[in-house]
């Protein structure tokens, strides 16, 4: 009985061959893929970086890992701006104020460079900005310190674009 399965397995394997022609289309290269598809980075620490060292990320910068020219070169369409609050600031009671300042910095980038960046509070806005050739700057809060134990602050930060 055991030897009966060997011819059956061989017959099944032989029937698994493909008569398809080899693919003749040239595959897309990295740049073509970046131009065609939306690329999202879910964590960019630019707001806190700018809080510590103000600079214009709409042009090439010498420090940090994000600026407009590098985003364009890498095909980055939607870098989530991380509203990061260090634990010490939370302990000192200044978390909400710092979060507001960091959100203001992101909004300032958009105001300063409306030809390069746009706000994005939904996937539809990210898609529309992509089609318009703008880099979306959605925001995400890295920790809950700015909520300060008050659930009303969840709505407050939602209204601010988080």
For each feature predicted by the language model, list its residue ranges:
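Bacterial N-terminal signal peptides
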Residues: 5-14
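N-terminal hydrophobic targeting/anchoring segments and the immediately downstream early-domain regions
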Residues: 16-162
């Amino acid at each position: 009985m055991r030897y009966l399965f060997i011819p059956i397995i061989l017959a099944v394997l032989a029937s698994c061959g493909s008569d398809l022609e080899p693919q003749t289309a040239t595959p897309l290269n990295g740049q073509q893929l970046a131009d065609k598809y939306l690329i999202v980075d879910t964590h960019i620490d630019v707001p806190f970086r700018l809080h510590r060292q103000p600079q214009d990320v709409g042009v090439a910068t010498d420090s940090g890992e994000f600026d407009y020219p590098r985003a364009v070169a890498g095909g980055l369409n939607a870098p989530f701006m991380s509203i990061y609050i260090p634990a010490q600031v939370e302990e000192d009671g200044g978390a909400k104020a710092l979060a507001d300042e960091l959100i203001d910095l992101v909004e300032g980038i958009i105001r300063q460079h409306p030809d390069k960046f746009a706000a994005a509070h939904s996937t539809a806005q990210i898609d529309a900005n992509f089609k318009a050739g703008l880099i979306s700057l959605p925001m995400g809060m890295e920790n809950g310190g700015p909520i300060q134990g008050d659930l009303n602050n969840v709505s407050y930060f939602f209204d601010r674009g988080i």
